[in-house]
């Protein structure tokens, strides 16, 4: 029960919000680069706020699902496809055993996120599942994902009420316009 990484992409790692409190000992916080997209990915699946996801940069991975789960894809537009057909972003997607998830190059943004309702089974190191490549800790063996890696799920497919209606309008998450309120 999990995912097989057929192609690792340019830089695909397991990330959460990172580990804090260890900087004085030489460990960086690590964690996701785009907190907003990360939180939306988990929110769509009713996951805990800090549940680990796959974060990929510029070129996404190719994943084979070895069991059923529900996923969400957020971040930049990487033109995701499931079994060769376009997949929607910012929505809950039911994945069947044997499904193949692929990505094109980044059309917008530089990072993408895949959250899993079954949770990735990677160890907690110093309070986080985030990959720290420099220190070679966390995530999957402390490194980026490579072809033929396999990550199991921690839980069987969770029931997700109304998953078909769990989506977010892409215009609502546009990064092209940002209004910051100020006090004069």
Sequence positions of predicted segments:
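A short, hydrophobic C-terminal helix/tail in secreted or cell-surface proteins
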Residues: 179-184
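Conserved "landmark" site that anchors the functional core of diverse proteins
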Residues: 1-178
């Amino acid at each position: 029960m999990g995912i097989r990484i057929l192609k690792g992409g340019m830089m695909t790692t397991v990330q959460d919000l990172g580990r804090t409190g260890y900087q004085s000992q030489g460990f960086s916080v690590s964690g996701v680069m785009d907190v907003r997209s990360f939180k939306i990915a988990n929110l769509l699946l009713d996951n805990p706020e800090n549940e680990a996801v796959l974060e990929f940069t510029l070129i996404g991975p190719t994943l084979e699902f070895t069991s059923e789960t529900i996923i969400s894809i957020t971040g930049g537009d990487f033109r995701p496809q499931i079994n060769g057909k376009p997949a929607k972003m910012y929505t809950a997607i039911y994945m069947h055993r044997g499904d193949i998830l692929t990505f094109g190059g980044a059309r917008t943004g530089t990072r993408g996120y895949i959250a899993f309702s079954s949770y990735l089974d990677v160890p907690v190191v110093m309070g986080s599942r985030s990959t720290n490549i420099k220190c070679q800790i966390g995530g999957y063996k402390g490194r980026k994902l490579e072809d033929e890696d396999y990550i199991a799920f921690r839980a069987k497919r969770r029931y997700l009420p109304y998953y078909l209606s769990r989506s977010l309008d892409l215009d609502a998450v546009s990064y092209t316009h940002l209004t910051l309120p100020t006090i004069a």
